[in-house]
């Protein structure tokens, strides 16, 4: 574990008080941390604190802050729009995209999704997915805490056409080159379909909206593999673009 992830309500001046029973158990009983030990603490969407344990009580840990690194906004934010996946595949995908780094995760019930999420009864999934995201942040040391959203289809999402350039992963698309220009946009949206690909109505919709259709110089990928590959591909392109 490279860091723990906490909310801002754990702050007490220059100190951080950890009262969460699971975190307490892991740090005290599993990792055997003691007074004087150091640990990085990520406060969601705020800062990373290099901290030191000053007191361990029967049900709390008190940290003092040695250094504060503010979380700077990236030059580009990446949002992914992925179809709901069957079984535990979505858990693995979430863990890996968080480790790579993504600003927003949108899970959509595509027309051809084999497994669909009940949007009106998603509280249990939200809780489970949030735990997966936190665990991935702890293990990877990534500072980007992504938002997660659920939608019933691709047609009525709150797309941001003025600030975001959207790319649809599809076999009919163009292969992106290192010369791809991302000028005038601060966000990238990557749209990946289900195992059965997009429906005809979804493809027509994306074309009407002027989205960019792209493909990758690879064999046909499973949906879960395509999500990871697409995100890593765009991250590499953006790093080259930003020098």
Swiss-Prot record:
Transmembrane segments: none annotated. Pfam families: Methyltrans_RNA, PUA_4. Gene3D superfamilies: 3.40.1280.10. The keyword Transferase applies. Its EC number is 2.1.1.193. Keywords: Cytoplasm, Methyltransferase, rRNA processing, S-adenosyl-L-methionine, Transferase. GO terms for cellular component: cytoplasm. GO terms for molecular function: rRNA (uridine-N3-)-methyltransferase activity. It is found in: Cytoplasm. GO terms for biological process: rRNA base methylation. It catalyses: uridine(1498) in 16S rRNA + S-adenosyl-L-methionine = N(3)-methyluridine(1498) in 16S rRNA + S-adenosyl-L-homocysteine + H(+). It comes from the Bacteria. The keyword Nucleotide-binding does not apply. Belongs to the RNA methyltransferase RsmE family. Specifically methylates the N3 position of the uracil ring of uridine 1498 (m3U1498) in 16S rRNA. Acts on the fully assembled 30S ribosomal subunit. This is Ribosomal RNA small subunit methyltransferase E 2. It comes from Borreliella burgdorferi (strain ATCC 35210 / DSM 4680 / CIP 102532 / B31) (Borrelia burgdorferi).
């Amino acid at each position: 574990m490279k860091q723990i992830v906490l909310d801002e309500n754990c702050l007490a001046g220059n100190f951080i008080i950890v009262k969460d029973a699971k975190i307490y158990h892991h740090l005290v009983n599993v990792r055997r941390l003691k007074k004087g030990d150091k640990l990085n603490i990520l406060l969601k969407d705020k800062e990373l604190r290099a901290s030191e344990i000053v007191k361990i009580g029967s049900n709390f840990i008190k940290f003092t802050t040695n250094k504060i690194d503010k979380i700077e906004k990236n030059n580009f934010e990446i949002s992914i729009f992925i179809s709901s996946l069957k079984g535990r595949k979505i858990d693995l995908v979430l863990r890996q995209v968080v480790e790579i780094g993504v600003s927003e995760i949108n899970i959509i019930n595509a027309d051809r999704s084999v497994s669909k999420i009940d949007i009106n009864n998603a509280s249990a999934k939200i809780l489970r997915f949030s735990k997966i995201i936190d665990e991935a942040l702890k293990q990877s040391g990534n500072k980007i805490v992504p938002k997660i959203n659920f939608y019933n289809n691709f047609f009525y999402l709150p797309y941001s056409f003025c600030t975001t350039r959207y790319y649809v992963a599809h076999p009919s698309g163009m292969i992106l080159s290192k010369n791809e220009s991302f000028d005038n946009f601060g966000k990238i949206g990557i749209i990946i379909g289900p195992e059965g690909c997009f429906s005809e109505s979804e493809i027509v919709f994306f074309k009407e909206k002027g989205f960019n259709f792209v493909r990758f110089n690879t064999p046909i990928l499973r949906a879960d593999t395509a999500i990871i590959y697409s995100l890593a591909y765009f991250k590499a392109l953006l790093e080259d673009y930003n020098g």
